[in-house]
From Swiss-Prot:
Belongs to the mimivirus R69 family. It comes from the Viruses. This is Uncharacterized protein R69. InterPro entries: DUF5769.
Amino acid sequence: MLSSYCNPNEPIPREIPSLKAHIFEYMYQYRNWSKFVGDVKKNHGSIDDLEFTITEFKHVHYMNVARVIVHGVEKFNKCCDNINNNDINLDCELTKNIQKHFQGCSEKIPQIYIYGNFCRSIVSGQLYDNINIMFHDDKCSEMFRQFCIPKNYICRNLQWNWSKGNVRGIDYELNFKGYNDYKVHLFLSWCNDMNIVPDNIYFDVDSLYSTISHENIHFMSSLKSLYPDCNVDKIIKNCTNNKFILLDNTKSPTITHPQPFVFSRNIHLKCINVNKEQHIKFLFLKMKSKGWKCLNEDCETPWCILQKDLLH
């Protein structure tokens, strides 16, 4: 199963689940799981100290996949840097394709970056749900899929050219031999201009992004926020404490919405209309269901998503 992760000519270090994890996974998949857990409790006295073992198989698999995908991000960015510095390796197919795509461009080739759920999960010490990567355009995302995702990955296109706000992208499902129940979602997205800030982020903790690996010792110091009003140190603190702030319409971490006496659409620029933004409400409730605490105060505006009767 280890061969599932990367190309033979580009080896990347991988972790191996413990024997206990393999046993638990086998029993979960092919045997009477309830009886097995009952027997463990009966003979061992408790299953509390085996809590990580139960999820270890999935955790190790997800982190092995992340290591390969993030390696691809660093590989892509290194090619961009080499082209920008006129240090071009003509034997590298990815470099040649990137150079051809940006031929005639007077500006430096922008780096790609990982953002959203993945960065938040790494900082908070939790297992990620998906990996989001931002590109200059759809052609760059296609080059990444072609040259940075191992050929032996079963890469299924779930949704082509989806759109959220000013962001477009492709939703891929990565499947692996021996890990059929643990599919990984990979979102390759773009704004057609790297100078445009994506507006499909709704929580401060999801605004973090980085261009380097989460295993790099400089990862934490490399983190930045997509939005200038969000303070990275405060975001990291919120992540470690499992707290979050719902960003207002201007992408600012406003805790308390101003409450004027006259309710006007023009006045309530901070409020998010729950009737128009049902997907934000869904994501908000999903965060809370996972144990994250919202730091925003209730809003008195009847149609605001933070109106207390709507979310409590």
